[in-house]
Amino acid sequence: MVKLAAKCILAGDPAVGKTALVQMFRSDGTHFQKNYTLTTGVDLVVKTVPVLDTNDSVELFIFDSAGKELFSEMLDKLWENPNVLCLVYDVTNEQSFISCTKWLEKVRSQTSGISLPGVLVGTKTDLAGRQTVDSAQAQVWALSQGLEFFETSVKEMDNYEAPFHCLAKQFYQLYREKVDIFHTLV
């Protein structure tokens, strides 16, 4: 049984639902807070995620940071050498989707040229009548950036775990590839 540890950056504009998503995931769906205050610094959420079809797991260290601090020195330090990325936008806020390009560039600038597995998550799908970001367009963009695509409603407890299970699986697959390469060298 292998237990890996991965640094996960949670990025996106303010008020897109990053904190709600990660808090729901941390509590296994038992905690949905109706009123959130904007994150002003960084919260660290740690949760062990089993890797499907194995006896192994990945402990995700999820850095939930304030969305308004796009170019702060604090983020530069905290975001050094991430292992996986969870990029979040609000399906009812087109600007939050457009901003994903800037967030992705910011996070990738911290990776020293290595491939960074990740997911793009559209939140607040329970507000479908107000949706301004086309799901197909978001999925095409995500795939063009090498990201898996998910939509979720934390309020409705819909699909909030899937992005994190995907991140754990992506990180685990990178680990397995490195182990396989190592075995070919020995």
UniProtKB/Swiss-Prot annotation:
Effect of loss of the gene: Null mutants retain the ability to ciliate and survive through gestation. They die shortly after birth due to different phenotypes reminiscent of Shh signaling defects: polydactyly, lung isomerisms, and structural heart defects. Conditional knockout in male germ cells results in infertility, abnormal sperm morphology, significantly reduced sperm count and sperm mobility. Mutant mice with germline deletion of IFT27 die shortly after birth with structural defects in most organs including the kidneys, where duplicated collecting duct system and/or duplex kidney is often observed.
Tissue specificity as recorded in UniProt: Expressed predominantly in the testis (at protein level). Co-localizes with RABL2/RABL2A in the midpiece of elongated spermatids within the testis (at protein level).
Alphabetical keyword list: Cell projection, Cilium, Cytoplasm, Differentiation, Flagellum, GTP-binding, Nucleotide-binding, Protein transport, Spermatogenesis, Transport
GO biological process: cilium assembly; cochlea development; inner ear receptor cell stereocilium organization; intracellular protein transport; intraciliary anterograde transport; intraciliary transport; kidney development; smoothened signaling pathway
Predominant localisation class: other
GO CC annotations on file: centrosome; cilium; cytoplasm; intraciliary transport particle B; nucleus; sperm flagellum; sperm midpiece; sperm principal piece
Localisation: Cell projection, Cilium; Cytoplasm; Cell projection, Cilium, Flagellum
Protein name: Intraflagellar transport protein 27 homolog
Provenance organism: Mus musculus (Mouse)
Gene: Ift27
